[in-house]
């Protein structure tokens, strides 16, 4: 059997966790240095550990941040049952945090012993259920095995056992529970095609979905589209999440993440009217944006053509976004698309643009700006030409006046033709002129 022993969080209910923390946390994603304690408090279980380890592995030369992340990951792992990941973290720490954060063989042996005893107990129970052919008991037995393997960090085995419950589901609620478990493990394994598949399966009966479950499915679908670089689809999913979700899906995603992922994907993929209608005027999504003021302000600045301010917000956010386990691979692509859209939007209203002033607005050199504009012109995204000597961009707007004259002349000719045809018909009827075909002899 395949095993993934990377990580584990505490045993948890994977489908219907209600989110015990109801406090409205303040923004973590901002231009300030990452407050790792506040950031980690947004999550629970395995994703909390994996996010901390991701930060420890990607924080560059910031040893203080790395040590804090490793220390918190160590403490969190010891609340669970994943001894393999514990050993890996201890090796990563390498005696740099003192004896308190060293190898605890007694703990590992005790946890492994309890895990083996629990596994034997679950096997005996499942064998009994299968002998008695009680479908509901068999379903719960496989589900318990899935929970067990998930807690031990064996994600492949957890996934297989959750999927085995499918043959013993007797209600729509059971099927949704199975799908939510499969989605959770698939996200942790990075198998986002599986995520999409089980989201679609859970949504087959939308009238039976509870609002909270529906919100979780939209989050999972948004993450899948994000990982597959389908940014517009990802934005739509995140924008449709009900704000009542709150912290109830923090074994996967925090409300601040929904605002950040949804906002950046929308900026990169929506046109101006969509941005206004689906983001800025979206009352539900506004609740998420309030948790991340920097993202809210950069969206408003972009829409209001305050590009210098927008780009400053983006620059200040970048270092923290690169430490995000889901977003880090997409930051450069999203930023590039947002910048291109800003350049295009800046040039649209003008017949000519002073490249020096435009370069100041975009915090770049004139030569660098020229190269960016050349690429956009070559891709036919901007209809313009560059006067490199005088450093001016001249727009090639269509001649609206000439086009209007041509359209009027065409309409006039068509009207004249129709009137002449009607007059001819009226005269023929007036003089009772009827063309008859010649009779055959």
From Swiss-Prot:
Component of the CSN complex, probably composed of CSN1, CSN2, CSN3, CSN4, CSN5 (CSN5A or CSN5B), CSN6 (CSN6A or CSN6B), CSN7 and CSN8. Interacts with itself and (via PCI domain) with CSN7 (via PCI domain). In the CSN complex, it probably interacts directly with CSN2, CSN3, CSN4 and CSN5B. Interacts with the 26S proteasome subunit RPN6. Interacts (via N-terminal domain) with TSA1 (via C-terminal domain). Binds to the translation initiation factors TIF3C1, TIF3E1 and TIF3H1. Belongs to the CSN1 family. Changing residue 222 to R: In fus6-T236; abolishes the interaction with CSN2 and CSN4. GO terms for biological process: embryo development ending in seed dormancy; hyperosmotic response; protein deneddylation; protein-containing complex assembly; red, far-red light phototransduction; response to absence of light; response to salt stress. Component of the COP9 signalosome complex (CSN), a complex involved in various cellular and developmental processes such as photomorphogenesis and auxin and jasmonate responses. The CSN complex is an essential regulator of the ubiquitin (Ubl) conjugation pathway by mediating the deneddylation of the cullin subunits of SCF-type E3 ligase complexes, leading to decrease the Ubl ligase activity of SCF. It is involved in repression of photomorphogenesis in darkness by regulating the activity of COP1-containing Ubl ligase complexes. It is found in: Cytoplasm; Nucleus. SMART domains: PINT. PANTHER family: 26S PROTESOME SUBUNIT 6 (PTHR14145), COP9 SIGNALOSOME COMPLEX SUBUNIT 1 (PTHR14145:SF2). This is COP9 signalosome complex subunit 1. Residues 1-28 are annotated as: Disordered. It holds the Pfam family CSN1_C. SUPFAM superfamilies: Winged helix' DNA-binding domain. The keyword Nucleus applies. The lineage of its organism: Eukaryota, Viridiplantae, Streptophyta, Embryophyta, Tracheophyta. One of its GO terms (cellular component) is COP9 signalosome. Expressed in leaves, flowers, immature siliques, and light-grown roots. Its main location: cytoplasm. Residues 230-400 form the PCI domain. Keywords: Cytoplasm, Developmental protein, Nucleus, Phytochrome signaling pathway, Signalosome. Changing residue 350 to A: Abolishes the interaction with CSN7. The PCI domain is necessary and sufficient for the interactions with other CSN subunits of the complex. It comes from Arabidopsis thaliana.
